[in-house]
């Protein structure tokens, strides 16, 4: 099932890139400073947003969600607060609440890329695969060069047994990010599961020819050779 997980992880990781340059203690120090500043200026939207961002860095999802709620109570049209409250609620597995915020955000900003990915992600987590697929189909039209969208759609298509569609999307993901071994492996694993061993081997060989280290695919190569007696 690893190749199916790549699609789901593609939806998740676009939101999960930590800020560089500070360790946990430095973030805690920043939080202490922000708490003092907020005590002096409790109506500052900027300070509340900055504090919420630090809460996220520290994994304090509930505190972050509370900060975004304070901001939205003052200005329901603040897109940063709306998006990141949806994100924090998804981290807290409050998917219905996250869905509400993503839909509000997309009503305000229909082309918000991360918002649409988040919308698809929570739909999937709620078991609404068709709705998630509808969102990703729309995103392919809106963002035809997004490798993340193709990979995410391929993962859901596999879960739904739509293997030919998934193969197409893994091919597109490879085309857009030809040096990503995970996409190659997902593509080849699906072909292997369909007993299309020669095609799977061709996908792996082409990736190695593109200078992806063969070691990434060692186990799958061995399984293919076992099936084909090579």
Protein language model features and the residues they cover:
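A conserved position within tetratricopeptide repeats
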Residues: 34-39, 72, 106, 140, ...
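N-terminal leader/linker segments that initiate helical-solenoid repeat arrays
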Residues: 18-62, 66
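Canonical tetratricopeptide repeat
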Residues: 50, 84, 118-121, 152, ...
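Helix-start (N-cap) detector for alpha-helical repeat units in TPR-like alpha-solenoids
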Residues: 45-46, 79-80, 113-114, 147-148, ...
């Amino acid at each position: 099932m690893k190749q199916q997980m790549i699609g789901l992880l593609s939806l998740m990781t676009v939101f999960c890139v930590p800020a560089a340059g500070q360790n946990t203690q430095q973030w805690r120090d920043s939080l202490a400073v922000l708490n003092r500043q907020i005590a002096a200026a409790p109506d500052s939207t900027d300070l509340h947003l900055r504090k919420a961002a630090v809460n996220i860095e520290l994994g304090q999802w509930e505190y972050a969600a509370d900060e975004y709620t304070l901001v939205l109570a003052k200005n329901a049209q603040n897109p940063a607060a709306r998006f990141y409250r949806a994100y924090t609620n998804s981290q807290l597995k409050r998917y219905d609440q996250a869905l509400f915020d993503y839909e509000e955000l997309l009503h305000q900003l229909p082309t918000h890329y991360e918002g649409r990915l988040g919308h698809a992600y929570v739909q999937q987590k709620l078991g609404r695969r068709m709705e998630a697929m509808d969102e990703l189909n729309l995103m392919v039209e809106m963002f035809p060069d997004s490798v993340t969208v193709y990979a995410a759609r391929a993962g859901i298509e596999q879960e739904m047994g739509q293997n030919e569609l998934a193969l197409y999307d893994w091919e597109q993901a490879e085309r857009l990010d030809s040096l990503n071994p995970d996409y190659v492996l997902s593509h080849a694993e699906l072909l292997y599961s369909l007993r299309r061993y020669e095609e799977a081997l061709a996908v792996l060989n082409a990736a190695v020819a593109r200078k992806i280290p063969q070691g990434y695919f060692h186990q799958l190569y061995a399984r293919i050779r076992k099936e084909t007696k090579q």
